[in-house]
Regions:
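Expand to "…catalyze enediolate/carbanion chemistry for C-C bond making/breaking, isomerization
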Residues: 2-9, 33, 37-469
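Low-complexity repeat regions of mature extracellularly deployed or surface/particle-associated proteins
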Residues: 23-27
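Compositionally biased, intrinsically disordered low-complexity segments enriched in Pro/Arg/Gln/His
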Residues: 15-17
Length: 469
């Protein structure tokens, strides 16, 4: 120990003692304030506080912009019906009987290649306890409502142009308006026009204008369940341009601002990863200014853009999984829903060929459902039986557990699994989606979980993030 250290140590000790004394005095004053009349301690809570209300106000003011941004960007699921698929029909092939034709052809495929529950279950590997339930419900669905979401295609699936495309777009509008008048329209219907890339931009805008104008002329208003699909989006600026286009149409016809929403189709690598390394799709959702309703994965265009050979272009390819995972994270909490792509292996030909295609399609749909992609594309009537079989088996297999856990959560009952509010939302959403598509009945769900439909919806779609305490 040096002479300098010996001389300075008493002074340092004295300073430390003074600091300790000031801290004790400060703490005593804080406790006095906390225990003063009118505080929480005086109100019988039995706790003491140190922070004055001004600190709460300061923190609230600091985070007010964040609170507003969370509400704007992440409003949660809209709570509307979610179709289990989107059926694409070329614009020149659409007729007034298209939906009924798809249902009849799907039923005919079952009659020919799986005429009873046992044979259908054997082909797909449906457990015996579910076989009859699933088969009966699939046939009823194909008879009652074979298509939940119809997209009239004026893009890759369409070969017209010029005056022919004008006429087909106008005819599509007349047919859709008529279907809504007579009650035969699908719950969701719309068109996919050409994209906004320079070579086809004007054509796409013209087709969309003809279709929307025709709906107003023949229906008096835009129908409920109207859905537009914007394909081959690579830059967020293309989404902004589409928003401006819809704003102009709404102003022209005196429609409520924001009336027309649309889906963004992810078919290019640039839509997933921008040149600067950021996730473009997240910026696209923001650029949609609240109009985006879905992100649809384009299996074959996206795979081709990455150089995947034709034989390996499928919705379960690792490249597809990566793209959809990015889409899923970008869309989470925004109210924008993610839709899986399609399979181009069609159930046609011999019974053996049909069964092979059915097994493939059924497996892809079940795989997507397990990954929370609750919607996908169907390109052929023969895919409807396996779409609904996969969906119904998924919801019915998880029905008893989901209903029991949600009922236990609602009653705060004990159980083998401790569920949190987020899990309760997922359980309620699972049951509601099952009811909406026909996999479950409202009555059996109410009995199983003890919750009436309105309470079930309240659990499934609380808006605004974390509930207050």
């Amino acid at each position: 120990v040096t002479d300098h250290q010996r001389k300075t140590r008493p002074a340092e000790q004295e300073q430390e003692q003074e600091q300790d004394q000031r801290q004790r005095q400060k703490g005593e004053r804080g406790r006095e304030r906390a225990a003063a009349p009118g505080t929480a301690a005086d109100a019988g809570t039995g706790v003491s506080l140190s922070l004055p209300p001004s600190v709460h106000d300061e923190i609230g003011a600091l985070l007010a912009p964040v609170d507003a941004d969370l509400v704007r960007r992440y409003p949660g699921d809209p709570g509307t019906r979610r179709p289990v698929h989107t059926v694409y029909v070329p614009g020149d092939a659409l007729t007034a009987g298209t939906l009924r034709s798809w249902g009849d052809r799907a039923l005919a495929a079952l009659d020919e290649h799986a005429p009873d529950a046992a044979s259908f279950a054997a082909v797909l590997g449906i457990p015996g306890g579910l076989a009859e339930q699933v088969y009966t419900r699939v046939r009823a669905k194909l008879d009652r409502e074979p298509v939940e979401d119809l997209r009239i295609d004026f893009e890759d699936g369409y070969t017209g142009g010029g005056a022919t495309e004008d006429a087909d777009a106008a005819r599509a509008a007349r047919l859709l308006a008529g279907a809504h008048r007579d009650g035969t329209a699908a719950p969701y219907t719309g068109i996919r026009a050409a994209c906004l890339e320079a070579p086809v931009r004007d054509r796409g805008i013209r087709t969309l204008d003809i279709f929307l104008t025709g709906l107003l002329e023949h229906g008096g208003a835009l129908p409920p369940g109207l859905v537009l699909t914007l394909p081959k989006v690579s830059y967020a600026e293309q989404v902004t341009a589409f928003v401006r286009l819809l704003e102009a149409f709404e102003r022209t016809h005196g429609l409520q601002p924001g009336r027309i929403g649309f889906e963004i189709q992810i078919e290019t690598s640039q839509a997933i990863l921008a040149a600067d390394g950021t996730a473009t799709v997240a910026r696209m959702i923001d650029a949609a200014d609240g109009r985006a309703t879905g992100l649809h994965y384009g299996t074959f265009d996206y795979s081709a853009a990455l150089g995947v050979s034709a034989a390996h272009q499928a919705s379960d390819h690792p490249a597809a999984d990566h793209a959809k995972a990015v889409m899923q994270v970008a869309a989470a909490g925004t109210g924008v829903r993610v839709c899986d792509g399609s399979s181009n292996v069609l159930p046609v030909g011999t019974t053996e060929q049909v069964h092979a295609a059915w097994r493939l399609h059924y497996g892809l749909v079940r795989r997507a459902l397990a990954r929370a992609y609750y919607q996908g594309w169907d390109m052929h009537p023969g895919q409807l039986p396996t779409r609904y079989a996969a969906v119904y088996a998924f919801y019915r297999a998880g029905f008893a557990e989901a209903a029991g856990r949600l009922g236990g959560y609602a009653e705060r009952a004990g159980g083998a699994v401790l569920d949190e509010p987020a899990t309760a939302r997922a359980l309620a959403s699972h049951l509601l989606r099952g009811i909406e598509c026909g996999a479950l009945d409202t009555a059996e769900t109410t009995v199983a979980c003890g919750l009436a439909p309105d309470r079930l919806r309240a659990f499934a779609a609380p808006r605004g993030g974390t509930p207050a305490r």
